[in-house]
C-alpha cells in the first residue's frame, strides 16, 4: 500500500477577513473550521507578479495550475504579449505578418475575433486595439471586429466602455467596424455545448443571427432591455449601410484570446476539415491565426507558440517511478492535466486521469454541488486503493458558482465542499497519507462589490490558503509564499529531490 500525497485545489477559494458577502467565511463549514484550527497553515499569493502576471492582475485557473505544476513562476502569455507591444515587436510577429500579407495579396478582409474586455484573464482589449493600429499601418483597408463580451471577469454590465473605445478607434482610422457581438457564453464554451458555439459561428461567418442592429452599442442596449448581461448577449450581427459582413474564402481571421481553454471549440469549427459537431455551409479556405496555441491539433498559425517547461511536478514524479492520478470534472479537467503539466497534452508514464462530466445545466447556481459528489467518491476510492503516490484534484464549485454572482448558491457550494473535505481528511488520515489544501485564485470570497453593491462575478486578488493535513509534524518555513512553492513542498514531504529548474521553495518543513 502506497501512502498517498494528495493535493486538493479548491478553485476560486480565496481568503478574506471581511464577512461582506463572503460566501466562504459566512458558510457553515465545520470541517474547514476545525482543520484551520488544528493543522499547520499559511496564506500564499496567487496573483500579480508572483504568478507571472502584470502587477495587480488577478490570477486565474490556467495561470494558477501552470505555476503550481511547474514549481516556478511562469511568465504568462499576457505578460509576453504586453512586452512585445511595449518593445514594438508585436507588429513584426511572423504569424501576424503572414495573416496581414494574405489579406493584402488577395484584396480580402481581416477579421479579428476575441473577448473585448479589460479583464486580462482570457484576453486584453489593449491587444485588440494594438492589432487594429498595426493593421492600419500595414495597409489593411477592411477590418471587421467580432466582439465577444465578458461580464464574468469584469462586472456583468460593463461592455459599453470597451465597445465605445473600439468603435472610436475604428472610426478614427477609417478602417472598418464591429461586425458582430456575442456573449462569451456562446463563443467561448468549453464543455461541448456545441449548440451555443454554432450560434456564435453562424453570426460571425454567415451573418446569420436572431438579431440584427445598426451598431454594436444598440445591440448591447437591446440586450440589456431583454435582461441579458454581457456574458449572455445572444449572437447579433451589425448592419452598416445595408451591408452584413461574412467570412469568405481568402480572408484572414486572427483570434485575439491568449488563454486556450475557452478558445478551442470555436477554433475547431473554423479550421477542421472533417468538423461534425454542427453543420457548416462549407469548410472555409482562410488564413486562421491564433495569438497563442489553443490545441496542438488545430491547423492554424500561432503568433506566440508555447515554451515547454522541463521538470514539472508530473515529470519529476515519473522520473522517480512514482504513480500519479489527476482528477476533476469537465470544467477544470484541462487545468489538472494540460496546464498542470506545463502545456503538455500527453500523460506521463505512471499518470492516470479521471474525468467526471460536469452537470448539464445552464448556470451552475442551479446545481451548486456540481459533480463534487462523484469526484469525491472517485478520490476516496483512489486513496483507499493504495495505488497512487500522488493525487492532484480540483473542485470547481467555489469558482464556477462564484462566477454566477449568486451569493446563496455560492454558500451552498462551499458547504457541500466542506462535507467533501471531511471525507478526504478521514481517508488520508486512516491511510497515514498527506493532504495539502489550497486554491488557484479567489472568487467566492467576494460575491458583491462593496463599492458598487452589485454582484461581483470576477476573481479576486486575495491570498489563498495552504494547509497541511497529516500525521507528520510540520512547521511553516516560508513567509509570503506563492503558488510556485507548492510543488517543492510536495516533493519535500515525499522525500524526492527538487530539480534545479524548480525555483520555488518549500512552504513547510517536516520532521523526519
UniProtKB/Swiss-Prot annotation:
Biological process GO terms, please?
glucose catabolic process; glycolytic process
* Entry superkingdom: Bacteria
Q: What is its EC number?
A: 5.4.2.12
Where Mn(2+) 1 binds, per the record, is at 399, 403, 459
GO MF entries: manganese ion binding; phosphoglycerate mutase activity
Catalytic activity, as annotated: (2R)-2-phosphoglycerate = (2R)-3-phosphoglycerate
Entry cofactors: Mn(2+)
Catalytic residue list: 61 (phosphoserine intermediate)
Q: How, per the record, is the cofactor bound?
A: Binds 2 manganese ions per subunit.
A single Gene Ontology CC annotation of this entry is: cytosol
Q: Record-annotated residues binding substrate?
A: 122, 152-153, 184, 190, 259-262, 332
Pathway(s) where this gene product acts:
Carbohydrate degradation; glycolysis; pyruvate from D-glyceraldehyde 3-phosphate: step 3/5
The residues that hold Mn(2+) 2 are 11, 61, 440-441
Keywords linked to the UniProt accession: Glycolysis, Isomerase, Manganese, Metal-binding
Oligomeric state and partners? Monomer.
Please explain the role this protein plays, according to its UniProt record: Catalyzes the interconversion of 2-phosphoglycerate and 3-phosphoglycerate.
User: Which HAMAP family does the entry link to?
Assistant: GpmI
Family affiliation? Belongs to the BPG-independent phosphoglycerate mutase family.
Any idea what this protein is called?
A: 2,3-bisphosphoglycerate-independent phosphoglycerate mutase
